[in-house]
């Protein structure tokens, strides 16, 4: 008799995706982040669902409802801080996942890569709208500043901003619709994750060498499930340490002040995971130019497969490209630091130089490094 795992229509899908899936034997811990992102998404949906049971999306009660969750709901503070810091974990895993894709040439699976970019945009949109919901000072002013960027679009800009706001400023209508979108988007993301996995399983996983590994495959379970569980335990430990010991480490103190349209905070800045893009936005003096640079800083990932000039897929054996990659990582960390600093000398010029370097590395230096390596290897 055939094992029910392999014959039943439902378990067959699970079996071919997570149990008997042929996986390269050489994949390292850098391949753990996909499963960690899945866990992050599940944690965010669960904690978010329970938070939504107590939260009220109304300008007069939103801030107090969050306070009520933290003070009066049983373990409400755990839910709230797991959700807030879970978002930070989500983005740490996301950036490491994208970085691994860049380093090992996983972007040559173009469908998987492009769905991944759409997922990145969707997660960023969800996180931005979630940050508005507690209705603190940074929530209100962050929403005002970021939505106002759309007014830079010629001709339709102002009408578009007022349409998104549902009025002439960020108010009750804005908060209500942001809550609705923040609630529905994670489920859309879940569906997109299925598509991401569907495309991935069409080609199979890449591996550190970048060489096809069809000759050397092992089943996903138990070998990689055990490895993923180790990664999960490490991530959950980090998350719980953050939640239990310093839950506000990554937050902004201004968000503990209720939103006040008459009082602007001295430094308006988004959460840490958007600071690199925010620094690129601020480094261009023109509003429309800044908005375009902001969008392109993420959208540039879509043209990376076209910029792949190397004869090798992975950077494992390409030292010049490795230098360029780590220079890009250092540049992104610099941009993240600059995004959190006030707009004054010397931060302005550092931000502008780092922004130019960011686009230069991806568009010019990396393809040139690959061509140089091809030439050195007489290819």
Swiss-Prot record:
The gene is MT-CYB. It comes from the Eukaryota. It holds the Pfam family Cytochrom_B_C. Heme 1 (or BL or b562) is low-potential and absorbs at about 562 nm, and heme 2 (or BH or b566) is high-potential and absorbs at about 566 nm. Heme b b566 binds at residues 97, 196. Binds 2 heme b groups non-covalently. This is Cytochrome b. One of its GO terms (cellular component) is mitochondrial inner membrane.
């Amino acid at each position: 008799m055939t094992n029910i795992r392999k014959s039943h229509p439902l378990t067959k899908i699970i079996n071919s995706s997570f149990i008997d899936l042929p996986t390269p034997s050489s994949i390292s811990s850098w391949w753990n982040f996909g499963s960690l992102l899945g866990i992050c998404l599940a944690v965010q949906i669960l904690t978010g669902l329970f938070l939504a049971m107590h939260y009220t999306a109304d300008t007069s009660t939103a801030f107090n409802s969050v306070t009520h969750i933290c003070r009066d709901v049983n373990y409400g503070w755990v839910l709230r801080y797991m959700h807030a810091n879970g978002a930070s974990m989500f983005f740490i895993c996301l950036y490491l996942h994208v970085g691994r894709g860049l380093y090992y040439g996983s972007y040559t699976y173009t469908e998987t890569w492009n769905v991944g970019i759409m997922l990145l945009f969707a997660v960023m949109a969800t996180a931005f709208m979630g940050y508005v919901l507690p209705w603190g000072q940074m929530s209100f002013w962050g929403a005002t500043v970021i939505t106002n960027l759309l007014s830079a679009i010629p001709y339709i800009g102002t009408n578009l901003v007022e349409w998104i706001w549902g009025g002439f400023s960020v108010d009750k209508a804005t908060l209500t619709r942001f809550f609705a979108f923040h609630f529905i988007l994670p489920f859309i993301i879940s569906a997109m994750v299925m598509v991401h996995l569907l495309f991935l399983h069409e080609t199979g996983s890449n591996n550190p060498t970048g060489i096809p590994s069809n000759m050397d495959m092992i089943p996903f379970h138990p070998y990689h499930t055990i490895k993923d569980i180790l990664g999960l335990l490490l991530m959950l430990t980090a998350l719980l340490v953050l939640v239990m010991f310093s839950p506000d480490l990554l937050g902004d103190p201004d968000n503990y002040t209720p939103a006040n349209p008459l009082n602007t905070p001295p430094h308006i800045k988004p959460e840490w995971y958007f600071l690199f893009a925010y620094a690129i936005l601020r480094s261009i003096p023109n509003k429309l130019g800044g908005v375009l640079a902001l969008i392109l800083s993420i959208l540039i990932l879509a043209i990376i497969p076209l910029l792949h000039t190397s004869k090798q897929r992975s950077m494992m054996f390409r030292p010049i490209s490795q230098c360029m990659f780590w220079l890009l990582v250092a540049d992104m960390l610099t941009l993240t630091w600059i995004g959190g600093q006030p707009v004054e000398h010397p931060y302005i010029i550092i931000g502008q130089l780092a922004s130019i370097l960011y686009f230069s590395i991806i568009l010019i230096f990396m393809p040139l490094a690959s061509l140089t390596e091809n030439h050195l290897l007489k290819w």
